[in-house]
């Protein structure tokens, strides 16, 4: 013990500080033991003895004033160290067990330090005017100036450990078998008393061991927990954190564990930035994708309206992309549209040929209109014109439908059917006008030839003239009569009675003659029209439909004469109107 003190007293400049620290050690030991015992008594008051009482038995009564002063100093120091009690209370039991083996030497060491305190004061040469109160004040300053972090820099841990080991060997030889369940704080204070011969850095090293031991253990445990929670590709969510909220509160402070929802002051707002964590869970249905796209469109539209209100013009593509949030909306919108298109394509592939059914039915129903209207034979131009535009599948379907439907011959030709063939009739009329080129008023011939002696070839152009003067409606009505009449002209032209007055010399007739011809022509027209109407009514009663071109062959003469009389009647009306105009002029 004497050699240890001599090692610390080689430098005379630290003599007063050494004496002050020696005076402080028993009292600080008593105070720390009292504090630790109070902490332990709060947890288990029955199983632990009063450590403060054991120290007071060994302490001499002459040091009571100094103990009171130093107790106040330690209490002030304990105020400056409010968090150390928390760390010491959390110290694991395994550390208490590991240090219990040294406790029997520590109790005897306390008694030895008290008995040798006077000897320290004499050898150090303490001045007479320094009282215990001054020593306590110096001790208080020393304690207040101790650093809390990196206290091991003053003295190496190896020297402190060797000094403590030598002291334990000397004291263990004196007393054996004494067991005192002192806490870890007693050992730290005892180390201060043992190393009191050294200057203040030795005192700092003792407190560093007491402070850093539980603090290092706590930091190691906390860092391992935080490493398990926050590190890695897949951070671990707190059990108190809702999985559905997709919260990332554990990333806000990497040095602290996630707090429960009840301790949080606010809820994290929903925004598009937080939606990025759920990109892996894209909506998988068409409805969800459509809603997502509509919401993005709504956001972009609101941005455009706000931009237009502020700058008085609509934003361009560059204005939209310059805003990071709008750029993200646009990218999400393009991605959502692409996913929606792929999803629809996938569903259509799964359904197979189901979407092709309705168009095929429509194509099959449309060509069946001529069949239902009773024109299976006369609808020859329709399949030829529509067959070029429809696919082979439609033709096959049309044939199948025609085979399934029963034949209907009593259907009527409607105006809608005539409008379908109207383009063909218009083309026929144009070609006919180009080829015929008729003249309304033929040249006047001076010879007075009879109608019988006049060649029939001269009458052919006049016969073809009325067709060009017919209106569109009449031409459509009687255009089907032209071809059969033309076909019958070479064979039956001799049997047809020529008119009494030819159309070539009608312009030479006077007004009374024209009026007589007008009355006769109207009478003939009524007669022929009546005959043709009776034929059509009888045919309709028999077949249930109006006669077509091939059905008019038995009445071809009447149809030809009726057509010629209509043309003559029109010419007479024109000539009479001309003479009336000339008379008025």
Swiss-Prot record:
InterPro entries: FAM13
Bias type Polar residues, positions: 262-275
Cystines in this chain: none
Domain of life from the UniProt record: Eukaryota
Keywords: Phosphoprotein
Basic and acidic residues bias locations: 27-45, 99-112
UniProt modified residues of type Phosphoserine: 131, 238, 385-386
Region of interest called Disordered, as start-end residue ranges on this chain: 26-45, 83-138, 171-216, 250-282, 349-391, 441-477
Leader sequence segment: none
PANTHER family: FAM13 (PTHR15904), PROTEIN FAM13C (PTHR15904:SF19)
Similarity comment: family membership: Belongs to the FAM13 family.
Name assigned to this protein: Protein FAM13C
């Amino acid at each position: 013990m004497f050699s240890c003190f001599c090692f610390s007293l080689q430098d005379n400049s630290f003599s007063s500080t050494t004496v002050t620290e020696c005076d402080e050690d028993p009292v600080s030991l008593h105070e720390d033991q009292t504090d630790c015992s109070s902490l332990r008594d709060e947890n288990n008051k029955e199983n632990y003895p009063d450590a403060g009482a054991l120290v007071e038995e060994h302490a001499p009564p002459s040091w009571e004033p100094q103990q009171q002063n130093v107790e106040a100093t330690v209490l002030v120091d304990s105020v400056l160290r409010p968090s150390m009690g928390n760390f010491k209370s959390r110290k694991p039991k395994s550390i208490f067990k590991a240090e219990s083996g040294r406790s029997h030497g520590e109790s005897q060491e306390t008694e030895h330090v008290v008995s040798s305190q006077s000897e320290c004061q004499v050898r150090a040469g303490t001045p007479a005017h320094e009282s215990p109160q001054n020593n306590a004040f110096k001790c208080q300053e020393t304690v207040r100036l101790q650093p809390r972090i990196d206290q091991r820099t003053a003295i190496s841990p190896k020297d402190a450990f060797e000094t403590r080991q030598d002291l334990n060997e000397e004291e263990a030889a004196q007393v054996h078998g004494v067991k005192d369940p002192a806490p870890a704080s007693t050992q730290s204070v005892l180390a201060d008393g043992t190393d009191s011969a050294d200057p203040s850095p030795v005192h700092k090293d003792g407190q560093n061991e007491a402070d850093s031991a539980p603090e290092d253990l706590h930091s190691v445990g906390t860092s391992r927990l935080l490493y398990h929670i926050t590190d890695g590709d897949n951070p671990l969510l707190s059990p108190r954190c809702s999985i559905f909220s997709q919260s990332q509160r554990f990333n806000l402070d990497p040095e602290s564990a996630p707090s429960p929802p009840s301790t949080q002051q606010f809820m994290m707002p929903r925004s598009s930035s937080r939606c990025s964590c759920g990109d892996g869970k894209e909506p998988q249905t068409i409805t969800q994708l459509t809603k997502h796209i509509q919401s993005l469109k709504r956001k972009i539209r609101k941005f455009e309206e706000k931009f237009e209100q502020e700058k008085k013009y609509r934003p361009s593509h560059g204005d939209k992309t310059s805003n990071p949030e709008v750029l993200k909306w646009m990218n999400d919108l393009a991605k959502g549209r692409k996913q929606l298109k792929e999803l629809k394509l996938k569903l259509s592939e799964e359904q197979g040929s189901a979407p092709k059914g309705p168009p095929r039915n429509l194509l099959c129903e449309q060509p069946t209109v001529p069949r239902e209207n009773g024109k299976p034979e006369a609808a020859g131009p329709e399949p030829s014109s529509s067959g070029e535009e429809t696919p082979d599948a439609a033709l096959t379907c049309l044939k199948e439908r025609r085979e399934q439907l029963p034949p209907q011959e009593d259907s009527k030709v409607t105006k809608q059917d005539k409008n379908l063939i109207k383009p063909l009739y218009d083309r026929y009329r144009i070609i006919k006008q180009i080829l015929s080129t008729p003249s309304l008023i033929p040249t006047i011939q001076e010879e007075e030839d009879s109608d019988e002696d006049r060649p029939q070839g001269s009458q052919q152009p006049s016969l073809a003239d009325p067709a060009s003067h017919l209106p569109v409606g009449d031409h459509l009505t009687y255009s089907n009569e032209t071809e059969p009449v033309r076909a019958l002209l070479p064979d039956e032209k001799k049997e047809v009675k020529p008119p009494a007055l030819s159309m070539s010399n009608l312009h030479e007739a006077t007004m009374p003659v024209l009026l007589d011809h007008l009355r006769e022509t109207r009478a003939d027209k009524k007669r022929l029209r009546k005959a043709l109407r009776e034929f059509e009514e009888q045919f309709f009663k028999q077949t249930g439909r109006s006669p077509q071109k091939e059905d008019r062959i038995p009445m071809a003469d009447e149809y030809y004469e009726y057509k010629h009389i209509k043309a003559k009647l029109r010419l007479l009306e024109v000539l009479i109107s001309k003479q009336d105009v000339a008379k008025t002029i």
